[in-house]
Structure formats: structure tokens, C-alpha cells
Amino acid sequence: MSPSHFAILFIIVISLVPLHGYANGQGFDANKLGSSVCHLGKCPKHREEVCYCCFNDRSRCYRSLYKCVAVCNRLVH
């Protein structure tokens, strides 16, 4: 492999590192947002399962934090 090919490959690999960090950061932001409108608890229908429920309406529970945040944000605003 010539030095110019190696340099191009190196630049491409280095440029992918911030994208990886950005993808990981999205999950953390969603958890921060979710903690303001949803709480983690046992599902009302299935006590052994864990769900995310709206703070304002505890009967609205979802297995996905993203779904809970989407629905509960509409209830708040």
C-alpha cells in the first residue's frame, strides 16, 4: 500500500470516530429527556416486566423509552 493510500485510509478512519461518539451520545440525551416525562417501573398489566410510564398519566406505559417520551411529550404540551 502506498503512503498516499495509507494517508487517505487513515483520514477516513479518523473521521468516523466522531460519528461513533455522536451515535452514542444520542442515547444519553434520550435518557435525560425521558427522565423528565417518563419513569421506569413495573408494567400495570404484567408485573414481572419493566415499562416506561408517563408521569402525568401512569396508565400509559410502554416498553420503549422512545415511545414513552413521544407520547408523554404530546400530553404535556
UniProtKB/Swiss-Prot annotation:
Q: Which gene encodes it?
A: ESFL6
Which family does this protein fall into?
Belongs to the MEG family.
- The region annotated as signal peptide is 1-25
Naturally occurring in which organism (per UniProt): Arabidopsis thaliana
| Example GO BP | pollen-stigma interaction
Organism classification, top ranks?
A: Eukaryota, Viridiplantae, Streptophyta, Embryophyta, Tracheophyta
- Keyword GTP-binding listed? The answer is no
The name of this protein is EMBRYO SURROUNDING FACTOR 1-like protein 6
Task: List the disulfide bonds in this chain.
Answer: 38-53, 43-72, 51-68, 54-61
Arranged from A to Z, the UniProt key words for this protein are: Disulfide bond, Signal
